[in-house]
Amino acid sequence: MRTLFQTIKQQFLEENDLVLASITASSGSTPRGAGSRMLVGKHGRITGTIGGGAVEYRAELMALDILEKKESDEHEFRLNRKDVENIGMICGGDVTVFFQYLDHNDPIVMEIAETAEKSYEERKDFWLICDLHATSGMSLYSPCYGLIGNADVPSSILSSLSAQPFR
């Protein structure tokens, strides 16, 4: 994840828009699980992976389309013989990928990337929170720095995050 935030920051400084492709749900046999992320720019995948192979290739093409449309979207890949898209995978599972459009002019995303980097340097816990609805907001929550971003996050969620035993 550290590389992801460093790359977002660098790409934004170069005035490049991005798409963050994240697996939000998976079931059955799939190459990668929920939480896997890949960052895509105008020339394709920059960093991260959502499993490689046909799913990642198709997701990369969809991300390039998202860059042109400048709107976030979601897509479900069905990995079986009866797959309507027939991407050639028969793992037997399903993968849902959320494509979050990141505008390089958005100061909130830059602040999130900078705060994440600072949190890594100081070895502080934080959570990236992505709104998977039409607004596709993004926030970062850290007990040290508070809530940064534009995702609508109830305070009850924030207080429960601080008590979680994971990073």
What is the predicted role of each segment?
Residues M1-R167:
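Segments forming oxygen-rich coordination pockets for charged ligands
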